Structures are given as C-alpha cells and as structure tokens.
Amino acid sequence: MGRRYFKSLVYGPVFSNLGLLVFYEIFKFLEEALERHKDSLIGDLLIPGMARTIALESDLAHYLGEEWQKDYVMREEVSDYLKHLNQLEESDPYLLCPYVYHLYMGLFSGGQVLKAKRMLSLSSIAGLKEDDDGGEKPGYSVTNYGDVPIGSLKRQLKKAMNELAENLDEETREQMLVQSAKVFEMNNVIIGSVKGVDR
C-alpha cells in the first residue's frame, strides 16, 4: 500500500476526482460495519474522532459539487472490493478488522505529511494558500482531525486491535493475517484504476 496509497489521495485531480472517490466507499462500508457490530469486540475499533465518511463527503462536495452523487458511477474495482468486504462480513465479521486497522493507520501516519505536501503542490498550480485567519482550507477535511491528536488515535486503535486479537482463537487470528496481506492487494487494485498514479 505505502507510497501509492498515500499518493492516490494527494495530488491535483487525482486527489479531487479519483483518490478520494475510490476510497470513499471503502471507508464508508467499514464505518457502517463497525456500527453494525458495535456490541462486539469489533466495535472497539471505532475510536471517537476516527470516522472519515462525513469528511470525505465534504471534500468530494467541495471538489465535485454538492450534487456529485447524482452522476456518480462506482468503479468496477471498487465494487469488487466491496463485494469482498461483504463476503467477509457474512462469513466472519472479525476478518474486516485488518482492513480497518491498515486503512486508518495509513491515513493517520501519512495524512498530515501529505496534507502539507498537497498544499504546496496545489499552491504552485492554482495559487492556493491557507486562509488569512489560519483556518482550514475547504477540501482538506479528510486529513483534519480537529483537536484530536493523531498520536492518540494511533495508540488507541493499536491497543484496541491488540486486545481484540488476544480474545480470538488461533484459527481466526491466522485468517486475519491472510486478510492483512489481502488489504494491500485490494488497495493496489483500486489505486491502479486511478489515472495519473504511477504503476
């Protein structure tokens, strides 16, 4: 996942039109799944302040217009990803946990650095700059966690994931390891569908 995952969310039209859009459905599904299973150990992974669905919708509305969903057609690669997640939830919801962990940890770890790089990149292209009052520029909600420290989110998610794994049987833990590798494969597929991202 690494560099390509982060890059797909950052630069120019890839960020505004494609990077956000292909991952929007994935984050939305995972957050809805966490809510569906909130009364189990899985629910512990939904750390307060972590959810990104509303932020993604805000950014997409900024870049694509308020009625962006009217003409939105899901990419086949994204549809396949969602089918895979649905199958996992039906067979064993705990197998969704590696997707939650890796996707959000990736956003936590790289989001702030890439936010700064994106600002520099877009300012050189379109003359964008931070608001005079120091406020958040519209379109950057996905990397804005407000007053919630990124380090705290990372520690809480890691702790919740470790505690969850400790309470599962060996077979389930092994299956989760398999899905941990699958996360990178699935992400690379949808990233590869985004034009302008190095393959």
Regions flagged by a language model, labelled:
Residues 1-199:
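Metal- and O2-centered redox machinery and metal/ROS homeostasis
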